[in-house]
Swiss-Prot record:
Keywords: Cytoplasm, Heme, Iron, Metal-binding, Muscle protein, Oxidoreductase, Oxygen transport, Phosphoprotein, Transport. The modification Phosphothreonine is found at residue 68. Nitrite binds at residue 65. One of its GO terms (molecular function) is nitrite reductase activity. Signal peptide: none annotated. O2 binds at residue 65. Its main location: cytoplasm. Its EC number is 1.7.-.-, 1.11.1.-. Residues 2-148 form the Globin domain. One of its GO terms (biological process) is removal of superoxide radicals. It comes from the Eukaryota. This is Myoglobin. It comes from Castor fiber. The keyword Metal-binding applies.
Length: 154
């Protein structure tokens, strides 16, 4: 399940592109998530009333949350699999406070991959795509293990 040094290099290279515009990427990821899986919107009190893509694009709260999500994920990715300290509080809040099922983390992972493919085709070829998918799968697996420790059946 672990990634090679070369795979981590690919992940972190494209992640540098994400960090250059966290707000734009985060907004696109959340819009893609909510459009593809409208049921996920119910978990977000701040924007569950938003229905149209135009409203989503205009929402400062949505943009801010996109930055929060991608900043946290970037912190995890930069640890190259040694992310216990980063994962623990994320799992705690997502299991006990927000009650986010692992399935929703799969959905947002798909949205992230799609946004990277569309925004960075030159930097996100098959190898980078495969590496990022592995990194996101590792993240989800480790969150799921923490969920289990916490007794959350998400």
């Amino acid at each position: 399940m672990g990634l090679s040094d070369g795979e981590w290099q690919l992940v972190l290279h494209v992640w540098g592109k994400v960090e250059a515009d966290l707000a734009g990427h985060g907004q696109e990821v959340l819009i893609r998530l909510f459009k593809g899986h409208p049921e996920t919107l119910e978990k977000f009190n701040k924007f569950k009333h938003i229905k149209s893509e135009d409203e989503m694009k205009a929402s400062e709260d949505l943009k801010k949350h996109g930055v929060t999500v991608l900043t946290a994920l970037g912190g995890v990715l930069k640890k190259k699999g040694h992310h216990e300290a980063e994962i623990k509080p994320l799992a705690q809040s997502h299991a006990t406070k927000h009650k986010i099922p692992i399935k929703y983390l799969e959905f947002i992972s798909e949205a992230i991959i799609h946004v990277l493919q569309s925004k960075h085709p030159g930097b996100f070829g098959a190898d980078a795509b495969g590496a990022m998918n592995k990194a996101l799968e590792l993240f989800r697996k480790d969150i799921a293990a923490k969920y289990k420790e916490l007794g959350f059946q998400g």
